[in-house]
A protein has these predicted regions:
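Asp-box/WD-like beta-propeller blade repeats and closely related beta-sheet repeat scaffolds
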Residues: 74-132
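Surface loop/turn motifs at the tips and blade-to-blade linkers of beta-strand repeat domains
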Residues: 23-26, 38-41, 106-109, 121-123, ...
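Beta-propeller domain segments
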Residues: 4, 11, 30-40, 44-46, ...
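Beta-strand initiation motifs
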Residues: 17-21, 92-104, 170-180, 223-227
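Aromatic- and glycine-enriched pocket-lining scaffold segments that form the walls
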Residues: 120-146, 155, 160-161
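Beta-propeller domains
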Residues: 2-27
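Generic structural signal for coil-to-beta-strand starts
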Residues: 9, 60, 137-140, 201-202
Length: 238
């Protein structure tokens, strides 16, 4: 079983019960290797891992994490455009003791680098991070709104969306969002789960709703999940 720990890294528990620490965050200890660009802050960090459908043949896994590698000037001056969450692809050796050949297949999922009062929230808020392969063979990646009202209804950004991509990060050709062909649906608050109905492949997300009422959403290609927290409105923002 592969798993991630938000502020530590990627590990695997083998059939014998042994735990192998594979790939750590910056300054982590005890891992076979580490990414110096990977960090945790608030709710951000290493948030998800999924095996390739052909893992038994290609030993490939995908990991979702927060990274400083692609921050750029946007993270200092305009955090609507701060690219700080990524999807990485790795090869795992046959003994399940180390990973190699890291490739960043998605580099521009937005991250919140500093605190805001309205909508409120500290650095690293609402990153999503859940991933799953669908019966169609594509990788579905759920992101979050970063507690920023601009995300929900802006389908040019990769916050508040579900991506549907291939193993190299390219959008599925049938995706209907023209602004960015990697996007399958938009208008999500903070995706915490992705699952597919066995009978017909219908995809569902579990995600945060306003206040404490979380929700299950049935996704439709090109659809809008409806999360629209206008900035500076009365009541709760993003």
């Amino acid at each position: 079983m592969f798993y991630t720990e938000k502020c530590k890294g990627l590990s695997v528990k083998t059939a014998s019960g042994k735990i192998n620490a594979l790939y750590g965050m910056k300054d982590s200890k005890g891992y076979a290797s580490a990414g110096n660009d990977l960090f945790c802050s608030g709710q951000a960090g290493m948030l998800g891992v999924v095996l390739d459908p052909n893992f038994k043949k290609n030993n490939t896994i995908y990991v979702y994490s927060t990274s400083s590698k692609y921050h750029g000037s946007g993270c200092k001056t305009n955090f609507e455009k701060c690219d700080g969450n990524i999807v990485m692809k790795f090869k795992v050796n046959k003994n399940l003791t180390k990973v190699s050949d890291r490739t960043d297949i998605v580099k521009d999922i937005q991250y919140k680098p500093f605190e805001s009062n309205q909508p409120f929230g500290g650095p690293g808020a609402h990153n999503g991070g859940r991933m799953a392969f669908g019966p169609d063979g594509y990788l579905y990646v759920g992101t979050g709104d970063r507690h920023r009202g601009v995300c929900g209804q802006d389908n040019t950004l990769l916050c508040s969306v579900v991506l549907r991509i291939d193993g190299n990060g390219n959008g599925a050709p049938a995706n209907k969002i023209k602004a960015d062909k990697r996007i399958f649906t938009y208008g999500h608050r903070n995706v915490q789960g992705i699952a597919f109905r066995p009978t017909d492949g219908q995809v569902f997300t579990a995600e945060h709703g306003p206040w404490h009422n979380d929700e299950i959403t049935a996704l439709v290609n090109g659809g809008n999940g409806g999360w629209d927290p206008h900035e500076k409105r009365a009541g709760r923002g993003a």
